[in-house]
Amino acid sequence: SVYSESNGKNDYTDDYKCRGIWVNYLSGGSAVNPTEKGLNIPVNMAFAFHSDAGTTLNDSIIGTLGIYYTNAYNEKFANGASRYLSHDLTDLIQSNIVRDVRTLYEPQWTRRGKWNQSYYEARVPRVPTMLLELLSHQNFADMRYGLDPRFHFTVSRAIYKGMLQFLCSQYNMDYVVQPL
């Protein structure tokens, strides 16, 4: 099953492994993933939204981390595009989040970096992919914002802007951010 690689024996691994598998199943047979069987839906990107664990001794902001992976499948996606597109997607989304959060909420919001790491969710999808670790759910300084609905809206809008910029760059199109 695309939802349970372990056939129900390990809910933890099924949770994170199913995401890349079902992205490939949805996109299989389409122009973005022509060699795999699937539903022939041209999925342009995959995105995993997480918070992560971690605390600081002085309760400072932990901030936002972006994760992608390039060193799989000969550094190419199924359609032949460079896996470095995941870096570009990650950079656009993370840059929009950090800029908007610093502007509207917290000038000291931390941009933790972009990790090119072999996380299953970043490695397996055959389309550009980003894992976002928005903030630390164990850290009070982060969660002061993480519990604020206005912050949720700002972050969601920043993600939308980054995805819009990424997609328009892929299709060589101008973009207009939907006004509020």
Cite the ranges covered by each PLM segment.
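Glycine-rich, acidic and aromatic/proline-enriched surface loops and short helix-turn segments
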Residues: 1, 95-99, 123-128
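Catalytic-core regions of hydrolytic enzymes
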Residues: 1-62
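Second-shell loop/turn segments in exported
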Residues: 5-13, 34, 73-83, 141-150
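Acidic, glycine-rich loop-and-strand cores that form catalytic or ligand-binding grooves
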Residues: 78-107
